[in-house]
């Protein structure tokens, strides 16, 4: 009997060329978006000196992404998915060019930043939805879990590298360089995506989009197991919105512009480690309990983050949050795929992604509001410990999720 490895199996990148192209495009895209993610809050903080305004930008972008995910789900089921992906990526690049040109003005427009955030959030989510819908055709349904873990690792590694580069660019060239390179990277992603095969939508009866979405909502509300997983995912994403406080906390810790990048890189770094060492997660006998406990630990890490006397200790707390949130997220993904009926998988995955975006937007708005009334340190701690209390209550209430057991799959030589 072969012992299951802790490490993630990357063989899909060798055996599936189309998935390899998506992997490359996604990595470049994440690096580009990371440059943007550092520049926007820092620019708004410098222009307004208001954490509320920083939170508002994240909230508006998150709202646009939510709408884009809903619209994108309909488009991906009715039109050729490769075309939807390419159109969405190219349109996003145009928005990044607009941010670059705005940053070069003597007096950049705050309204333009907000509007372009809406633009990019909407079109970016169109591409995400189409790519999610196309993934089974690219890798085969039997490889979806492995593809999901590789995708998480790609996103996290890119998110580690890009904030560090973004911080250095801020210290040397200003936000315009961040926006310009983000636009260039986005257009470069079109090259590997052009090699994808045609991805036509599956034949299906015509149904009003709202009716289909309502059926998905009803399933979530009726299933304490799947609904509980979705609720935990939303709360976990709310906690990650602590990044809107990074610029203000950086001032409190007297960090340089280059050091700010370490704050943005810490969570992705921890999550990358979590994804890379996720080989045994799918074999957990009680994944629901493990999901709940890892989520509670993540909330505790955020509560302690703002209390740290030195920024390097804060980075450690953020990395711990990233690792625990990766464990929880991978378990959420696995259980959603196995506990959701085949006919509901598309809608439930879309709604799960959308509620994560919504949780991020709500968390950003709440933290921005807290930042206007409290110190950044108090805001970060209040959010973390508040979510921890809610998490403990859910640990007691979500009985079916807590007690859920599964039979570990058989380990073969190819899995080791």
Curated annotation (Swiss-Prot):
<feature type="topological domain" description="Cytoplasmic">
    <location>
        <begin position="400"/>
        <end position="416"/>
    </location>
</feature>
<feature type="transmembrane region" description="Helical">
    <location>
        <begin position="56"/>
        <end position="76"/>
    </location>
</feature>
<feature type="topological domain" description="Cytoplasmic">
    <location>
        <begin position="200"/>
        <end position="218"/>
    </location>
</feature>
<feature type="transmembrane region" description="Helical">
    <location>
        <begin position="84"/>
        <end position="104"/>
    </location>
</feature>
<keyword id="KW-1003">Cell membrane</keyword>
<feature type="topological domain" description="Cytoplasmic">
    <location>
        <begin position="131"/>
        <end position="156"/>
    </location>
</feature>
<keyword id="KW-0472">Membrane</keyword>
<feature type="topological domain" description="Cytoplasmic">
    <location>
        <begin position="77"/>
        <end position="83"/>
    </location>
</feature>
<dbReference type="InterPro" id="IPR020846">
    <property type="entry name" value="MFS_dom"/>
</dbReference>
<dbReference type="GO" id="GO:0042931">
    <property type="term" value="F:enterobactin transmembrane transporter activity"/>
</dbReference>
<keyword id="KW-0812">Transmembrane</keyword>
<feature type="transmembrane region" description="Helical">
    <location>
        <begin position="179"/>
        <end position="199"/>
    </location>
</feature>
<comment type="similarity">
    <text>Belongs to the major facilitator superfamily. EntS (TC 2.A.1.38) family.</text>
</comment>
<feature type="topological domain" description="Cytoplasmic">
    <location>
        <begin position="337"/>
        <end position="356"/>
    </location>
</feature>
<feature type="topological domain" description="Periplasmic">
    <location>
        <begin position="240"/>
        <end position="256"/>
    </location>
</feature>
<keyword id="KW-0997">Cell inner membrane</keyword>
<comment type="function">
    <text>Component of an export pathway for enterobactin.</text>
</comment>
<dbReference type="Pfam" id="PF05977">
    <property type="entry name" value="MFS_3"/>
</dbReference>
<feature type="transmembrane region" description="Helical">
    <location>
        <begin position="22"/>
        <end position="42"/>
    </location>
</feature>
<dbReference type="InterPro" id="IPR010290">
    <property type="entry name" value="TM_effector"/>
</dbReference>
<feature type="topological domain" description="Cytoplasmic">
    <location>
        <begin position="278"/>
        <end position="287"/>
    </location>
</feature>
<feature type="topological domain" description="Periplasmic">
    <location>
        <begin position="43"/>
        <end position="55"/>
    </location>
</feature>
<feature type="transmembrane region" description="Helical">
    <location>
        <begin position="288"/>
        <end position="307"/>
    </location>
</feature>
<feature type="transmembrane region" description="Helical">
    <location>
        <begin position="110"/>
        <end position="130"/>
    </location>
</feature>
<keyword id="KW-1133">Transmembrane helix</keyword>
<feature type="transmembrane region" description="Helical">
    <location>
        <begin position="219"/>
        <end position="239"/>
    </location>
</feature>
<feature type="transmembrane region" description="Helical">
    <location>
        <begin position="157"/>
        <end position="177"/>
    </location>
</feature>
<feature type="topological domain" description="Periplasmic">
    <location>
        <position position="178"/>
    </location>
</feature>
<feature type="transmembrane region" description="Helical">
    <location>
        <begin position="257"/>
        <end position="277"/>
    </location>
</feature>
<dbReference type="InterPro" id="IPR023722">
    <property type="entry name" value="Enterobactin_exp_EntS"/>
</dbReference>
<feature type="topological domain" description="Periplasmic">
    <location>
        <position position="378"/>
    </location>
</feature>
<feature type="transmembrane region" description="Helical">
    <location>
        <begin position="357"/>
        <end position="377"/>
    </location>
</feature>
<protein>
    <recommendedName>
        <fullName>Enterobactin exporter EntS</fullName>
    </recommendedName>
</protein>
<feature type="transmembrane region" description="Helical">
    <location>
        <begin position="314"/>
        <end position="336"/>
    </location>
</feature>
<feature type="topological domain" description="Periplasmic">
    <location>
        <begin position="105"/>
        <end position="109"/>
    </location>
</feature>
<feature type="topological domain" description="Periplasmic">
    <location>
        <begin position="308"/>
        <end position="313"/>
    </location>
</feature>
<dbReference type="GO" id="GO:0005886">
    <property type="term" value="C:plasma membrane"/>
</dbReference>
<feature type="topological domain" description="Cytoplasmic">
    <location>
        <begin position="1"/>
        <end position="21"/>
    </location>
</feature>
<keyword id="KW-0813">Transport</keyword>
<dbReference type="InterPro" id="IPR036259">
    <property type="entry name" value="MFS_trans_sf"/>
</dbReference>
<feature type="transmembrane region" description="Helical">
    <location>
        <begin position="379"/>
        <end position="399"/>
    </location>
</feature>
